[in-house]
Amino acid sequence: MELAKSFDPKDIENHWYSVWETAGYFSPAKREEVNAYCIMLPPPNVTGTLHMGHAFQHTLMDALIRYHRMLGDNTLWQPGTDHAGIATQIVVERQLDQEGKDRRQMGREAFLERVWQWKEESGSTITRQMRRMGTSCDWSRERFTMDEVLSRAVTEVFVRLYREGLIYRGKRLVNWDPVLQTAVSDLEVVSVEEQGSLWHILYPFEHRAENGEKGLIVATTRPETMLGDVAVAVHPEDVRYRHLIGHHVRLPLSERTIPIIADSYVDPAFGTGCVKITPAHDFNDYQVGLRHKLIPLSIFTLDGKINDNAPVEFQGLDRFDARKKVITDLQAQELLVETRPHKLMIPRGDRTNTVIEPMLTDQWYLAMEGLAKQGLAAVESGQVRFVPENWAHVYNQWLENIQDWCISRQLWWGHRIPAWYDEDGNVIVAYDLEEARKLSGKENLHQDEDVLDTWFSSALWPFSTLGWPEQTPELKTFLPGSVLVTGFDIIFFWVARMVMMSLHFTGEVPFREVYITGLIRDAEGQKMSKSKGNVLDPLDLIDGVALTELIRKRTTGLMNPKQAESIEKATRKQFPQGIPAFGADALRFTFASLASHGRDIKFDLQRCEGYRNFCNKLWNATRFVLMNCEGKDTGLDEGLPLNFSPADKWIIGRLQQAEQSVIQAFNEYRFDLAAREMYEFIWDEYCDWYVELAKVQLNSEDEARQRATRRTLVRVLETVLRQAHPIIPFITEELWQAVAPLAGKTGASIMCQPYPQPDQLRIDEQAAADIQLLKEVVNACRTLRGEMKLSPADRIPLLIEGDRARLINFFPHLQALARLSEVDILPGGLPDTDAPVAVVGDFRLMLKIEIDVKAERERLNKEILRVEAEISKARVKLDNPDFIQRAPEKVVQQEKGRLVTFSTTLKKLDEQLRKLD
């Protein structure tokens, strides 16, 4: 098989993905006798497109799945998408808006038909993009959170929880989006620091002045909400106000009086130490209100206007217009004492950017206390393990302080709550209308208008996708799953809820391990966001993108169009030529190399370029092997003699060590260490050293030596292709198809081959020592050549002082790799000349050439300083009692050996310097 001269990923990627999917390689093996390995894909929003966070996590999941597939496990990577209630409804409403239509005019049924139509037309965008990354999910099992099977599971769970007394309806404070007019979760609220004001307002005493004071001065950042105040609170130990507790003040701009109460929630040092209490529109105030049995007074309509509970002159005003009027009226009545600039965190909806309003509304809730105890026990007992383990603390902290979950949303798109009402307002929770009529004995029922929080159906994902509530073979085989790969930002919203729901309904944990990844940031450590203009599209890194198109993508759809100019300027500076095509393998290798256990991951485009070069290196090495081995004897006939050289034995031994390191890294979720080991072995050991040594051996007149060299070349290469396949699947498949026959391997795909396992018996310590010496001598020669500024074309004789037997067999390799005309070991030692001398252990090396004495003296002094520094480092360690006591004995002995070696080297360098003098 002839490979193209250069690596072009595009054709390879398109070809092989189609082959894999068509052949059914992504599906489970369906063999009960083998170990099951299952990963549930965190379902991306059906509205979404692939972003860097997806691409990063999908790469890691795919690497794990491919690795375990090659280990022979019965693997399932369950894909699917989330209906994403709010996000999807917004997308479709915006389309309708462009057509001059409104969903309320259309009606619920027609609107939902339109959403389903959009989902069928556009909902598969992200899964097509996932295929471009090489993700080997079992697409035949793809699920959608609102498909028939999953919807049935959602209804089953809701009805059971209600009948167990865990779901109830109640009026509580929620995050309310006045634009969407729905409750939203904390995850959909983004708190942004903004410049605001702190208004100091006089609340006059009810009857008379106290100690000459007219009233209490209250500090607030939201003067409009004072229309809903029901108390003023002070700290019970605050001596300034303790005597006023139990008295009343008049609420400015209103006819009401409100009490002065004592509560330790108040910070005496903030503002004036007096806090207005508005339980209907502040989460902290709501808790204060509960403690003091205050009746909340809601003053906002659901669209953020002032309602009829406020004085008539404010009714109907938008909340921000009401703020202006409140301030103006307070000034007119001389009740506004002071206004100060004040920075504060403003909660905004992540979809609408509107200020989120705490709002008292009727909602459905799930009682969490009992479920949380199960969730905590699962981690404490080790049934679920977090990697890194510190994230278990975050999980536990949330469950230990959990509140009941508001599970209803005021949307049309989503799982409609299976609750019906009769004409008297009685609620009937049932599986369907027919059962509701049966239970109520009434025909005229209407269903609850609300839908469930998207996270409710997502919490059932690990078992609903396997066919629950039916007891399917898949449920029996793949629950618990093996690992969940996700981000730390949804430990509360998703991970914990999956654990609780799975335990409650199946008695099993949803997964045994949770691998928490870091957050992908830009090269400067900034979070990638549209507003910052630093977002990268993974497909642009795979296919490349022109500068004009990159600017268009970054400046379209900005919430603040004024940012477009600065974003364009920054983009032109960073990517003057656009972004070149790196291919999926280079991007995947970049992600793997960055996947440490840190919280933040800086994505540097230069890494992509470096790993594209790595792919080229692997490609070119394979071309060399094919050119020298195809059509020739590669040692397949075991009856023919094989004469393995120390170089062959060394690379085979190094391969065993690399295999051990990579397996350990995969098992510990250290993708960065796996990638580094692969990179260093392939580039440094195999390509830069072994291939160069093999070139010499292929010119040997010993046929058994040539045969052994060709066998080693192809078998080591075939093995590293299998080893690297989970991370770089496309190039390894293409190259394996060409190399495998030469290594005696058969099979339709590298995906179906066994993963390389180390054999410690194949490590030859003597060969390793011999090649290490050879490498050091070659490097010393190259250093001498560089310092003497010799042209690569100049072939110079090398003179050596030392043990002839240790190097005699490597003269041809030395000549080739160090570009020498000849090599000679002098029994009487090196000549007493001004020529520079390099020291390698017990060997002294000299290139036979006239030298610049001054330059050589500088070189020796520089080398002496370096060696003295190494001696100092070694002595510091060996003089440290903690190091001697705590370090492994092997490490201590290594350090002692280093000290002896460097001391010997220093002595020889001093001798050389004296000779120059």
Swiss-Prot record:
CDD domains: Anticodon_Ia_Val (cd07962), ValRS_core (cd00817). GO terms for biological process: valyl-tRNA aminoacylation. A motif ('KMSKS' region) lies at residues 527-531. It is found in: Cytoplasm. One of its GO terms (cellular component) is cytosol. A motif ('HIGH' region) lies at residues 44-54. ATP binds at residue 530. It comes from the Bacteria. SUPFAM superfamilies: Anticodon-binding domain of a subclass of class I aminoacyl-tRNA synthetases, Nucleotidylyl transferase, tRNA-binding arm, ValRS/IleRS/LeuRS editing domain. GO terms for molecular function: aminoacyl-tRNA deacylase activity; ATP binding; valine-tRNA ligase activity. It catalyses: tRNA(Val) + L-valine + ATP = L-valyl-tRNA(Val) + AMP + diphosphate. Keywords: Aminoacyl-tRNA synthetase, ATP-binding, Coiled coil, Cytoplasm, Ligase, Nucleotide-binding, Protein biosynthesis. It holds the Pfam family Val_tRNA-synt_C. Residues 850-880 form a coiled coil. Its EC number is 6.1.1.9. It is an enzyme of class 6 (ligase). HAMAP family: Val_tRNA_synth_type1. Monomer. Catalyzes the attachment of valine to tRNA(Val). As ValRS can inadvertently accommodate and process structurally similar amino acids such as threonine, to avoid such errors, it has a 'posttransfer' editing activity that hydrolyzes mischarged Thr-tRNA(Val) in a tRNA-dependent manner. NCBIfam families: PRK05729.1, valS. ValRS has two distinct active sites: one for aminoacylation and one for editing. The misactivated threonine is translocated from the active site to the editing site. The C-terminal coiled-coil domain is crucial for aminoacylation activity. This is Valine--tRNA ligase. The gene is valS.
